Amino acid sequence: MPRQATSRLVVGEGEGSQGASGPAATMLRSLLLHSLRLCAQTASCLVLFPRFLGTAFMLWLLDFLCIRKHFLGRRRRGQPEPEVELNSEGEEVPPDDPPICVSDDNRLCTLASLKAVWHGQKLDFFKQAHEGGPAPNSEVVLPDGFQSQHILDYAQGNRPLVLNFGSCTUPPFMARMSAFQRLVTKYQRDVDFLIIYIEEAHPSDGWVTTDSPYIIPQHRSLEDRVSAARVLQQGAPGCALVLDTMANSSSSAYGAYFERLYVIQSGTIMYQGGRGPDGYQVSELRTWLERYDEQLHGARPRRV
């Protein structure tokens, strides 16, 4: 009898040790996963840091007005003269990509601007979207009713879907909205367009610029984002508009901060524009749409 009791005791101790090892193993795996993520983020920061320093140095130089005027003036002179386009009434149409203007009273190298630049470069580095790859089906929100949807819900069959990311406080985005609207009017028969309102580029409580056409603080809630999007919607009629989530899921997936253009077709990214402000070029989108239109209608048989 004593021997049996002893054997039971030993078995009980073994079961207890196995039960204790379960939580310990789970904790160890969790710790290892967090360590790997930390190492990956550290490595990415080391890769991004030289690029960030270069941008910061450029912003510091541009705070000297003589350098700013010379640099911006040289960029304007280096750009080819756009072809003059006339509307139906014979009036000259503004260019697709008007030059970026920075007022003399705006400081470019500040703590707020450096935070915004770092945020944008980090989103671009970690984005899931790449030209030729699958389009992330990230979550978006309808302005009316806050109903949750996804970006690919707006894709219809084989029709291209143009994504235009931006906000009201981004001067290049707003300055080129009229050019974007002309493309919507011209190609909406064969192409779908979607504006995704993201976090403010130059909020009144962040990186402030007097060149921004609106004074809007950072969004603290979806209600704030809806209010800002309503302002944009008044100037962009006829085009579907949705909101990015407060977790900025779409902006993160597409690396869209400050602004960006994409074209999706059959779940694949066919065109990926550069990151704004410099890479945001409506003229590039126009070129892509013109080529698509030629291929689409050129393949159709002609009536004799």
From Swiss-Prot:
Expressed in placenta and several fetal tissues. It is found in: Cell membrane; Endosome membrane. One of its GO terms (molecular function) is thyroxine 5'-deiodinase activity. Residues 1-44 are cytoplasmic. Residues 68-304 are extracellular. Residues 82-95 have a biased composition (Acidic residues). It catalyses: 3,3',5'-triiodo-L-thyronine + iodide + A + H(+) = L-thyroxine + AH2; 3,3'-diiodo-L-thyronine + iodide + A + H(+) = 3,3',5-triiodo-L-thyronine + AH2; 3-iodo-L-thyronine + iodide + A + H(+) = 3,5-diiodo-L-thyronine + AH2; L-thyronine + iodide + A + H(+) = 3-iodo-L-thyronine + AH2. GO terms for cellular component: endosome membrane; intracellular membrane-bounded organelle; plasma membrane. Its main location: membrane. Monomer. Homodimer. May undergo minor heretodimerization with DIO1 and DIO2. Belongs to the iodothyronine deiodinase family. This is Thyroxine 5-deiodinase. It comes from Homo sapiens. The lineage of its organism: Eukaryota, Metazoa, Chordata, Craniata, Vertebrata. The gene is DIO3.
